[in-house]
Amino acid sequence: KRVVYQGVEGAYSHIVTKKLFPDVETENVNTFEDAINEVLNGNAKYCIIPIENSSAGIVSDVYDLLLKKDVVIVAEYDLHISHCLLGVRGAKLGDIKTVYSHPQALMQCSAYLKEHSGWSQISLLNTAVSAKKVRDDKDISQAAIASRLSGDLYDLDVLDEGINRNANNTTRFVVLSKDKIFSKKSNKLSLILELPHEKGMLYNILGIFVLNGLNLVKVESRPIPEKTFEYRFFIDIEGNLSLSNVSNVLEILKKEVTFLKILGNYCSVK
């Protein structure tokens, strides 16, 4: 039972993977799509993917992959994120000219980076990849925004810590599988909908959930590239597929919407 994550050792995805699967063989890959493909081709049982951050919002690439890939969410995990500024041994804050990190991490630390407006910001694939680059380049003018674990793994000094603008900074990770695993304990259901382009349609569709006593946890829209200013909706609700009001809503949606995909029925892991 292998588990795969995107990035390198020290990445936040790696931290979550080790928390959820401490005794399982893990593998790291370069991109989110690579991670999902490892699951689809049978090389891994699960992959761990970040889907949303409480400060910077959704990871849009992941939402697009959930649409086109035949995987389901089987669990979610919220990780409190505290970013550190990491430099080579002996570097000081005054030495820094360039900061590397994942675009989401740069956004989460935007207020801190504004205070250091002279620094160049360069996006890389992953926070831990950024730490590894700083270690490999051995340049005191470079820093990475990453986890304290990345600093330990890549022998870097912590120049500053807790630099994210929101002290409650949290990233939601999902566990993806190609096996459609649904448990009677599952309490969250994720869907993708596309609606007819008609006036009041979104209002009517959301009303179906309310009338059936279902709590909408999240509604996120993404543009449909091939349809100008039309959107698909990613919806999270509280509920279980075995409940009559949930099955009733799904039957109504099948008749009313132009596209429906169940992304998973799952629980939060604490």
Please state what every model-predicted region is.
Residues 1-270:
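Domain-level signature for soluble enzymes in the chorismate/prephenate branch of the shikimate pathway
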